[in-house]
């Protein structure tokens, strides 16, 4: 299943429109290239509808939010919906400020998303209207653990059913769920949290997988999350004592570039609930 999703991505090479943040935009573009797709990073309202129309998928990331890009996100999201293109939302820091939270809610009201990907604090904020987001990282009280995994899975399924989107909650244990099934994924390495933008890269990667597998968004999102986590493991195994987080970032992108569908299928560590 994951193998097929990755094979489709490599063979179809979709063009992915990213309205993302300027902290990680270069890494996101390189991640899209590494997986076999092509990126375009356009965020001016005068062209986003045109750009979205020629792309196979759209990735919306609110990491460096401003009033100009909010307009662009709404225009692009609605155009993608009209065309039936998959749309990914990364609600970076939702709950940390009124602007971020209000914008995330407006996007959810006005755009139908294929996948909503965030940490547990961000997703809980979207689901409940309140949260304890600490910057853009999950608050320590909101970690998904083996002890609370059943409850977290039930929460993810309920939110997915309510929104009609696949919900991807990423952390030490990742959950990717629709209203009926959930993938619990245990790939990755703790050092990934030392690299700014691994989540942003994952959202761009998810948009690429979804564009190449439009009829199977749950499996596409799960494949993206497994691939990113596996890349984190492979990259960490390459590090020498003199390497740090910048080298690790590059090795993660390299790992996706060099990853084969067979390697993903073999290395993915998940269960379905």
Where are each of the predicted segments found?
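Glycine-rich phosphate/adenosyl-contacting loop at the front of the ribokinase-like
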Residues: 1-41
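Conserved phosphate/ATP/ADP-binding segment of small-molecule kinases
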Residues: 100-182
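Charged C-terminal helix
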Residues: 230-273
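Short pre-catalytic strand/loop immediately N-terminal to key active-site residues, enriched for Gly-Thr
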Residues: 183-196
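Glycine/small-residue-rich loop that forms an oxyanion/phosphate-binding "nest" at active or ligand-binding sites
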Residues: 69-118
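Conserved post-catalytic alpha-helical subdomain immediately downstream of the catalytic base
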Residues: 196, 205-248
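Active-site cofactor/substrate anionic-group-binding motifs, chiefly glycine-
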Residues: 31, 35-84, 89
């Amino acid at each position: 299943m994951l193998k097929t999703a990755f094979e489709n991505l490599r063979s179809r090479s979709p063009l992915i429109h990213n309205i993302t943040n300027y902290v990680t935009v270069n890494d996101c573009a390189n991640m899209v290239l590494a997986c076999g797709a092509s990126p375009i990073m356009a965020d001016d309202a005068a062209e986003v509808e045109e750009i979205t129309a020629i792309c196979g998928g759209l990735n919306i990331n609110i990491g460096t939010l401003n009033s100009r890009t909010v307009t662009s996100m709404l225009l692009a999201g609605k155009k993608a919906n009209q065309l039936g293109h998959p749309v990914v939302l990364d609600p970076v820091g939702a709950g940390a400020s009124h602007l971020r939270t209000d914008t995330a809610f407006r996007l959810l009201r006005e755009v139908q998303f294929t996948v909503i990907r965030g940490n547990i604090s961000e997703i809980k904020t979207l689901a409940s209207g309140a949260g304890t987001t600490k910057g853009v990282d999950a608050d320590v009280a909101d970690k998904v653990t083996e002890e609370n995994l059943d409850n977290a899975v039930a929460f993810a399924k309920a939110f997915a059913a309510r929104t009609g989107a696949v919900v991807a909650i990423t952390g030490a244990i990742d959950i990717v769920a629709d209203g009926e099934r959930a993938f619990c994924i245990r790939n990755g390495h703790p050092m990934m949290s030392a690299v700014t933008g691994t989540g942003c890269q994952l959202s761009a990667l998810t948009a690429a997988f979804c564009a190449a597998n439009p009829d199977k968004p749950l499996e596409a999102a799960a494949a993206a999350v497994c691939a990113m986590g596996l890349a984190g493991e492979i990259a960490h195994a390459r590090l020498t004592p003199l390497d740090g987080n910048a080298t690790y970032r590059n090795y993660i992108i390299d790992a996706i570039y060099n990853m084969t569908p067979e390697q993903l299928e073999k290395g993915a560590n998940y269960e379905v609930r």
